[in-house]
Amino acid sequence: EEGLAWVPHTRTLDVFKWGEWVNDLVLEFGVPSFIWASPPCLEFSNAYGAPKAIWGRENPGEPYEPDMSILHAVEDIVARVRPRHYIIENVAGASPHFTPHLGPHFQKVKSFLLWGRCPVLNVPSDWSHSKFDKDPHSSDPWRANKRAYVPLELSQAVVEAISHQTTLEEWC
């Protein structure tokens, strides 16, 4: 398995080099109708062993400054490509850092906070998700990627929300 090449219709591209590939993708496939971005949550997690929590314990009262470069790259991609819908997903600990750039999140689904432009997702209230489900061994170099999968139920909710969305243009 080289990277995530085993995932159908997946390309592994460097988000920091988006200027090198975004135009080719738009030419090949057209403007995407939807973009989902999930910057790595480690920097923003409130978990005890995460950098943010460690910083707070070691530097009480001092502001934590996470690396926002991936979020900025995603913002640039969305501004350049202008998809009809997009979601930027992260954990609750990202909220104080994302909100100044993206505004408030539009929906919270369990532990997922969603920012962007998308209809509200209809996810069953009894749905549950744990990042530890089918958790690969810690020696797996792709562990973080595999744990970061967007759950199928969320993906299905996005498809349904977008498919059933009626725009004002469609009424005219």
Report each predicted region and the residues it spans:
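Conserved active-site and SAM-binding loop architecture
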Residues: 1-172
